[in-house]
């Protein structure tokens, strides 16, 4: 039984609550009215705790911060059971969540982040996990001491930060304790004196929680997103260098996969830990694209397993990124026919990668002697590193990972732009020990020796902001947040939840088939008019086309303008008021809410890599209508979890949309099947197993010759965890990888 020690004192406005609230019904639940709020106020919290009353009770303090000031405070005291740490932990957990939920509901706010004291986390190890998964709060842990500390710099300059990094102490470093005469304190009995018989100045629990809230706020940047953190030598310090604790409980990861996958991961991770193998990933961008999303999730999981892994990115260069994007489009066959890789662009590209590479091969760098033991290099931006590594450390195994489609039918056409780009890249890639491709036919040029070729799909994380289940309270916050950029750009708004919507989540890229999405929607609306004339137009679903871009993607604005021009032209402008086209700020939860609250998902790419966005949609129970391109057919079971169409066959897409929207039984059947038939291979844990396997095999000194095999098949065999009958996996159809 908890005892309120100090209650929240601020009062919410009933007038504002009334003005922001509305009661609506949805097409799925027409007879149930749901109260929603137009917007929720972003807030932050600080949480601290300590044992009191001779360790018989535990006091919890929560400070509320609005981004400028600490606005409120509450504390509660709960009894503790001596020796029962599990029960005590769960009781503390429940009280913290209850205090925050209560304040959220009463004040119409959404907590985005919470500073957690290390002392509290030690008593309640899974508190951060629960805050993240249950309340969508980013927990950031700080070692806030129960006594006052002072600056390590001289008092007269302690508020100045020198231009030299060595002159100031980074957050989390040890700072000296402030001591005073024992006689100056009212009740010094619980404090320990130092050698000079002086005592530290105590910091009360409310001061500790307030400090945690203020420190937490420092880690949030524009659009209230956690700041990206880049460390020395451009190492991506995932989760603010470990201060952000999203998933502390490995059991949460275990529950996302089957026993075979999990057992394999644990066996491989154990061997790498014992051998102290160091793994290094090198890719072009730390945020925004699919590769960056996978790497953040992978590093987070492997760090939780205590595997020694690091991820590095180069200094960004807009000039080089334009070149790499052109190369990407050329290799996929979606660039203008006259676009070429010039010698000037090659020279700038080579100089850029050499400059960055020399930082990593210099003494103490990840590629210098004593650095990483296995190197993984992502995509066509980084292969220039390979010859440099081979020169400095010829013994280090290098794995090249290709995430994109390489038109094997075009790269061997003499004089073609594709041949030109591929020859330039292959000159470096051929020095790698292994070439990993998506398991899609004709994705690999014939230059790549079959014995070096291995297959691995893309992945997504079921526990990150992009895919985790959002509480309805948090979901409505993000739907409300979506209205802000729509209003700012004078874009039409979604009328959700009163109306359903169809969604395609993808970058604004020439290969994503967005014109086909618009045309398919137009034809679908015409079908509703002709085949279901009794259905009111207000019951017709809207269309949402959205996505956010990568740092190295300069095409987005060009494609966005083309789509807006198309939507407002004949014949599509008739439905333009129901088409929402938005580039979103970089918020994973925002994309999550857009997908989770949709009715049907589309993915009408004309050229594609693997496109794991399809599995993300299926995981939420959304039937997906997509084109037979890239790795998409591997993820959808036609007629069971969605429909596969030929690129450009917009009449077929419209027909499938009509069937799914008007036949509730069909929709429910497909939705249930989609939700329960997603392979472990496309999740972080299954994907991590592949990287762990490669690191283990190379650490044993073995020369891997996969001969076009799936890495997941090799690792399951190696670890003695073969696939069992009925276990969901991507179809192992016969592939013609090199056309």
UniProtKB/Swiss-Prot annotation:
Keyword tags:
Carbohydrate metabolism, Glucose metabolism, Glycosyltransferase, Transferase
| Documented EC number(s) | 2.4.1.231
Its biological purpose is as follows: Reversibly catalyzes the synthesis and degradation of trehalose from glucose and alpha-D-glucose 1-phosphate. The equilibrium lies in the direction of trehalose synthesis.
Record carries keyword Transmembrane helix:
no
Descriptive protein name: Trehalose phosphorylase
One Gene Ontology term from the biological process aspect of the record:
glucose 6-phosphate metabolic process
**Propeptide feature ranges:** 1-26
- The answer to whether the entry has keyword Nucleotidyltransferase is no
Give the multimer and partner information: Homodimer.
**Which molecular-function annotations from GO does this UniProt entry contain?**
alpha,alpha-trehalose phosphorylase (configuration-retaining) activity
Group of enzyme by EC = transferase
Which residues does the annotated region (Disordered) include?
Answer: 1-28
């Amino acid at each position: 039984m908890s005892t309120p020690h100090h209650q929240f004192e601020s009062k919410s406005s009933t007038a504002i609550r009334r003005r922001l609230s509305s009661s609506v019904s949805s097409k799925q639940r027409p007879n149930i009215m749901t109260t929603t709020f137009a917007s929720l106020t972003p807030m932050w919290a600080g949480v601290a705790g300590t044992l009191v009353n001779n360790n018989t009770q535990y006091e919890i303090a929560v400070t509320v911060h609005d981004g400028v000031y600490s606005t409120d405070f509450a504390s509660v005291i709960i009894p503790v059971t001596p020796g029962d740490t599990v029960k005590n932990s769960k009781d503390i957990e429940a009280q913290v969540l209850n205090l925050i939920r209560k304040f959220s509901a009463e004040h119409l706010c959404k907590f985005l982040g919470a500073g957690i004291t290390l002392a509290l986390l030690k008593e309640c190890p899974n508190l951060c996990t629960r805050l993240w998964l249950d309340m969508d709060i980013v927990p950031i842990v700080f070692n806030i001491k129960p006594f006052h500390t002072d600056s390590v710099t001289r008092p007269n300059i302690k508020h100045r930060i020198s231009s030299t990094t060595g002159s100031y102490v980074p957050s989390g470093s040890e700072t000296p304790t402030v001591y005073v005469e024992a006689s100056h304190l009212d009740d010094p009995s619980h404090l320990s004196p130092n050698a000079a018989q002086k005592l530290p100045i105590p910091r009360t629990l409310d001061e500790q929680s307030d400090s945690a809230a203020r420190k937490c706020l420092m880690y949030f940047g524009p659009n209230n997103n956690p700041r990206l953190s880049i460390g020395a030598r451009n190492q991506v310090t995932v989760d603010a260098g470990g201060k952000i604790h999203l998933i502390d409980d490995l059991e949460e990861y275990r529950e996302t996969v089957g026993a075979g996958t999990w057992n394999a991961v644990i066996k491989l991770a154990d061997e790498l830990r014992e051998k102290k193998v160091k793994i290094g990933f090198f890719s072009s961008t730390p945020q925004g694209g699919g590769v960056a999303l996978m790497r953040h999730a992978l590093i987070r999981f492997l760090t939780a397993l205590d595997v020694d892994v690091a991820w590095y990115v180069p200094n960004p260069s807009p000039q080089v990124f334009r070149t790499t994007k052109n190369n990407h489009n050329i290799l996929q066959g979606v660039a203008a026919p006259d676009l070429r890789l010039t010698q000037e662009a090659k020279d700038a590209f080579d100089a850029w990668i050499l400059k960055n590479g020399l930082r990593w091969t210099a003494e103490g760098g990840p590629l210098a002697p004593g650095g990483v033991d296995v190197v993984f290099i992502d995509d066509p931006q980084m292969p220039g590193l390979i010859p440099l590594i081979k020169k400095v450390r010829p013994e280090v195994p290098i794995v090249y990972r290709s995430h994109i489609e390489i038109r094997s039918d075009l790269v061997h056409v003499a004089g073609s732009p594709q041949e030109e780009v591929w020859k330039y890249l292959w000159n470096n890639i051929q020095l790698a020990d292994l070439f990993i491709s998506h398991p899609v036919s004709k994705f690999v040029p014939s230059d790549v020796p079959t014995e070096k070729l291995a297959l691995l799909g893309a992945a997504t994380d079921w526990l990150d902001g992009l895919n985790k289940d959002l509480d309805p309270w948090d979901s409505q916050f993000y739907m409300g947040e979506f209205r802000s950029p729509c209003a700012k750009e004078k874009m039409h708004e979604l009328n959700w939840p009163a109306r359903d919507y169809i969604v395609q989540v993808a970058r604004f890229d020439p290969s994503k088939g967005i014109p086909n999405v618009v045309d398919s929607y137009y034809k679908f609306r015409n079908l509703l008019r002709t085949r279901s004339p009794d259905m009111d137009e207000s019951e017709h679903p809207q269309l949402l086309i959205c996505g956010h871009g990568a740092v190295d993607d300069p095409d987005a604005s060009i494609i966005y303008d083309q789509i807006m021009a198309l939507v407002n032209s004949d014949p599509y402008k008739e439905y333009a008021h129901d088409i929402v086209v938005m580039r979103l700020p970089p918020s994973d939860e925002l994309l999550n809410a857009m997908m989770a609250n949709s009715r049907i998902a589309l993915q009408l790419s004309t050229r594609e890599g693997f496109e794991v966005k399809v599995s993300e949609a299926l995981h939420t129970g959304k039937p997906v209508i997509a084109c037979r391109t890239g790795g998409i057919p591997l993820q959808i079971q036609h007629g069971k979890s969605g429909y596969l169409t030929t690129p450009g066959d917009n009449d077929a897409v419209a027909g499938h949309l009509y069937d799914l929207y008007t036949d509730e039984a069909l929709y429910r059947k497909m939705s249930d099947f989609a939700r329960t038939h997603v392979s472990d291979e496309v999740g972080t844990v299954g994907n991590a197993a592949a990287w762990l396997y490669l690191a283990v095999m190379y650490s044993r000194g073995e020369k891997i010759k996969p001969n076009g095999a799936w890495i997941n098949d090799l690792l399951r065999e190696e670890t003695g965890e073969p696939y069992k009958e009925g276990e969901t996996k991507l179809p192992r159809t016969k592939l013609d990888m090199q056309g």
